[in-house]
UniProtKB/Swiss-Prot annotation:
It comes from Agrobacterium fabrum (strain C58 / ATCC 33970) (Agrobacterium tumefaciens (strain C58)). The lineage of its organism: Bacteria, Pseudomonadati, Pseudomonadota, Alphaproteobacteria, Hyphomicrobiales. It holds the Pfam family Carboxyl_trans. GO terms for biological process: fatty acid biosynthetic process; malonyl-CoA biosynthetic process. Belongs to the AccD/PCCB family. GO terms for cellular component: acetate CoA-transferase complex. This is Acetyl-coenzyme A carboxylase carboxyl transferase subunit beta. Acetyl-CoA carboxylase is a heterohexamer composed of biotin carboxyl carrier protein (AccB), biotin carboxylase (AccC) and two subunits each of ACCase subunit alpha (AccA) and ACCase subunit beta (AccD).
Length: 298
């Protein structure tokens, strides 16, 4: 098949005067430096620009595969919920937006969750797919998050959250906002069970997601250069009529002001998480999969 694909087909196309089929997005441009990077090199480097270290948005499926040992994990089923309960329409029907996002991402909604081993330690991981309607939090996403927390409680294992979101999904109105207290309750249930909850803040983490489960972790790790906020910089400046500091709302700024615990390069996150979780769960070095609950807080 390789001989036919690599030799015969190009010769036939050349004889017939056909142009070779070139896939789109072979080269990716760094938003920070303008550097062009071959897409395969970018994928191999975990969507981090090699020269500048700029962290591009990483697809949810790729992040889960990178996190778990050998890329092997059990994907949690997406809960079935009502579609477009408000019959919402702006410039486009909400149902059409859902259909387009599903075709683009090959996901039912923004949340992907899985159970697997991280350096031998069983964990539940929850990841936002930003390409699905800007990772917005709606009924389906909220239900998926709650189910993931319930699974972590039943398995008695830690949960790691990777938010990347523009906030609550406006097309679902108050039903979307209801997911903020629901997910907050789920976080509290995990903590009451004595299991660690670590949040890895990625670019961007904003709005209602920041106002709920994204800022309730036992430890908050942030990727370099990530925008982390509730309201955007422009909105705040227009409200207070003052210029905000340089780098305001970036992960580095939040680290300096005590809002996050550490800023870690994406390529180092799996090892960092594994080391941290083994300490937090008191997992024996010779049996990393044995999870001991944290002591209840006073």
């Amino acid at each position: 098949m390789n001989w036919i694909t690599n030799y015969v087909r190009p010769r036939i196309n050349s004889m017939l005067g056909r142009r070779p089929e070139v896939p789109e997005n072979l080269w990716i441009k760094c938003p920070e430096t303008g550097e062009m990077v071959f897409h395969k090199d970018l994928e191999d480097n975990k969507w981090v620009i090699p020269a500048s270290g700029y962290h591009m948005k990483m697809p949810a499926k790729a992040r889960l595969a990178d996190l778990f040992d050998g890329g092997i994990y059990e994907a949690l089923a997406q809960p079935k919920v009502a579609q477009d309960p408000l019959k919402f329409r702006d410039s486009k029907k909400y149902t059409d937006r859902l259909r387009d996002s599903r075709a683009k991402t090959e996901q039912e909604d923004t949340i992907l969750a899985g159970v697997g081993l991280l350096k031998g330690l069983k964990i539940v991981a929850v990841v936002h797919e930003f390409q699905f309607m800007a990772g917005s939090l709606g009924i389906a996403a909220g239900e998926a998050i709650v189910k993931a927390f319930e699974r972590a409680i039943s398995e008695r294992c830690p949960l790691v959250m990777f938010p990347a979101s523009g906030g609550a999904r406006m097309q679902e109105g108050i039903l979307s906002l209801m997911q903020l207290p629901r997910t907050t309750v789920a976080v509290n249930m995990l903590k009451e069970a004595g299991m660690p909850y670590i949040v890895v803040l990625t670019n961007p983490t904003t709005g209602g997601v920041t106002a709920s489960y994204a800022m309730l972790g036992d430890v908050h790790i942030a990727e370099p250069g990530a925008e982390i906020c509730f309201a955007g910089k422009r909105v705040i400046e227009q409200t207070i009529r003052e210029k905000l500091p340089e780098g305001f709302q970036t992960s580095e700024y939040l680290l300096e002001h005590g809002m996050v615990d550490m800023v870690i390069d994406r390529r180092e996150i799996p090892d960092t998480l594994a080391s941290m979780l083994k300490i937090m769960t008191k997992a024996p070095a010779d049996n990393a999969n044995a999870v001991v609950p944290l002591a209840a807080s006073a």
